[in-house]
């Protein structure tokens, strides 16, 4: 950006550098746009599994909490307290990796889900003490298989949403699988594809969001958008602890803890990527430990108030490389944006007013990208007979 032309490379690579306010606001908003859809989508999916109507007050609440606690967890990373936080520009958001586990837990009850999230988050934070020592247990073969399997599991969910929604209630509607739903989903996919490959910068990074906005506007003209929920929603609301209860289920807790290990390894990779790509150095043990602490504590606190598990967002790591600005104050501004959005139910209601087929088009793209990320991890694997056998059995 023109206002950064006179800034030295040393400052741009310095996490403590504070750019001019107008630059920080623009860059911070870019970080929010790059992660917004990925952050709120898991909440909408879990709301559907829990039986909450699309656009209901409970769905709006879960969307709010996903924004609010993504912002709070990000502040834990950028500002930190004590040993908590990498103190690097690490953007946090709701993790897709936990969605398969959360779907099963939500079917048992929301109290069971949030009990698992809180305890899983505490276990995640505990791993910060020794995360560096167990990284070698999760080579690209293991991590890649897990991420690929998650993506493959989730893609059918996206297809159901594109058709008009998952679950018996949505699938029993006469419009389910109709041309109107598929048309909206396909518009999202085509616009996202076009913007990703034929534009650059923040437009390319926000291609899925812009694709969904395009389809949303078309849906308004089709008469498929109900604005009544926005009118009813309040302008301001605080989070409510244990709104859905807190129940202990050993199976769910074990599953959450296992996925926390995967999430912790992902965060370590993202922090390493930020340090290497943004500052041309290796991440320190203190940064890796602090980042893992923030990941876990952010998840545990979110679970208390109805938020879902948080992790670092890889797309924002790429955005740092693209802008060349390593400043953690920029991501702090992004966190403040998210917190403000999370305190305004009308924003959650606006997101929830989106036709479910529009969301379906977006999640087909995003879940496909999750699977692609797993394949990318596997590209560095030495495909000998041993590894091929491990891959075949694990994927089956």
Feature-to-residue mapping (PLM):
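Intrinsically disordered, low-complexity non-transmembrane regions of multi-pass membrane transporters
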Residues: 1-27, 168-173, 227-240, 276-283, ...
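N-terminal signal-anchor module of multipass membrane proteins
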Residues: 1-89, 97-105
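Hydrophobic transmembrane alpha-helices of multi-pass solute/ion transporters
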Residues: 7-18, 191-195, 208-257
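Membrane-embedded helical hairpins/re-entrant loop segments and their flanking transmembrane helices
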Residues: 21, 47-87, 257-328
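Hydrophobic, membrane-embedded alpha-helices of multi-pass small-molecule transporters
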Residues: 22-39, 176-192, 207, 222, ...
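Short, non-helical or kinked segments that cap or interrupt transmembrane helices
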Residues: 61-62, 83-97, 136-145, 203-210, ...
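Interfacial segments of multi-pass membrane proteins
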Residues: 103, 196, 316-331, 337-342
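Membrane-embedded alpha-helical modules
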Residues: 105-226, 335-396
């Amino acid at each position: 950006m023109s206002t950064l032309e006179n800034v030295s490379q040393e400052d741009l690579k310095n996490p403590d550098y504070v750019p001019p306010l107008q630059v920080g606001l623009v860059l911070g908003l870019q970080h929010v746009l790059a992660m917004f859809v990925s952050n709120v989508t898991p909440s909408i999916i879990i709301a559907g599994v829990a039986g909450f109507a699309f656009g209901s007050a409970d769905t709006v609440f879960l969307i709010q909490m996903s924004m609010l606690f993504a912002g709070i967890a990000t502040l834990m990373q950028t500002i930190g307290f004590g040993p908590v936080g990498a103190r690097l520009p690490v953007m946090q958001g709701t993790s897709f990796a936990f969605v398969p586990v959360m779907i099963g837990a939500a079917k048992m009850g929301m109290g069971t889900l949030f009990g698992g999230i809180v305890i899983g988050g505490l276990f995640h934070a505990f791993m910060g003490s020794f995360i560096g020592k167990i990284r070698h247990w999760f080579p690209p073969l293991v991590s890649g298989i897990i991420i690929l399997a998650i993506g493959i599991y989730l893609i059918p969910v996206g297809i159901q949403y594109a058709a008009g929604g998952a679950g018996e209630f949505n699938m029993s509607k006469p419009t389910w699988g109709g041309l109107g739903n598929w048309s909206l989903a396909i518009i999202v996919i085509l616009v996202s594809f076009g913007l990703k490959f034929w534009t650059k910068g923040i437009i390319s990074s926000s291609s899925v969001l812009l694709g969904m906005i395009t389809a949303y506007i078309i849906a308004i003209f089709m008469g498929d958008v109900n604005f009544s929920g926005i009118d009813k929603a309040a302008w301001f609301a605080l989070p409510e602890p244990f709104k859905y209860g807190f129940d202990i289920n050993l199976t769910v807790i074990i599953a959450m803890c296992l996925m926390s290990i995967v999430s912790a390894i992902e965060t370590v990779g993202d922090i390493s990527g930020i340090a290497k790509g943004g500052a041309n150095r290796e991440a320190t043990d203190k940064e890796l430990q602090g980042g893992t602490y923030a990941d876990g504590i952010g998840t545990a606190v979110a679970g208390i108030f109805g938020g879902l598990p948080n992790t670092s967002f890889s797309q924002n790591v790429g955005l740092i490389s693209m802008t060349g600005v390593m400043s953690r104050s920029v991501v702090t501004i992004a966190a403040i944006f998210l917190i403000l959005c999370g305190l305004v139910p009308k924003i959650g209601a606006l997101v929830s007013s989106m036709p479910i087929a529009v969301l379906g088009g977006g999640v087909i793209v995003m879940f496909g990208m999750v699977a692609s990320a797993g394949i990318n991890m596997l590209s560095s694997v030495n495909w000998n007979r041993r590894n091929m056998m491990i891959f075949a059995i694990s994927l089956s």
